[in-house]
Amino acid sequence: MNNATFNYTNVNPISHIRGSVIITICVSFIVILTVFGYIAKIFIKNNCTNNDIGLRERIKCSGCEPFCNKRDDISSPRTGVDIPSFILPGLNLSESTPN
């Protein structure tokens, strides 16, 4: 009646290491993208002033062009990395407002 016991000594260590490496690479990639996106937003925000945009955009966005969060404005591309809410809950770096 001892057939239900599992023997974990036969687990292939190569496959275990391979899985750990894949997970580490994925997590590192997400962290690197987040850091680079955040740094890019800081540099862009420091380099733009209210004089860089016209009256129409100032009324529409009330700030620098790259940070315009209106969906109908296609003249100002957004920069940075959008982090899905299920990966980092409570951390909003994308500055997007839900409609």
From Swiss-Prot:
Virion surface side stretches: 1-18
GO cellular component: host cell membrane; membrane; virion membrane
Xref: InterPro entries: InfluenzaB_glycoprotein_NB
Intravirion-facing ranges: 41-99
A Pfam short name: NB
Membrane topology of this protein: Single-pass type III membrane protein
Function of the molecule: Putative viral proton channel. May play a role in virus entry.
Protein's UniProt name: Glycoprotein NB
Organism: Influenza B virus (strain B/Memphis/3/1989)
Lineage: Viruses, Riboviria, Orthornavirae, Negarnaviricota, Polyploviricotina
This protein's encoding gene: NB
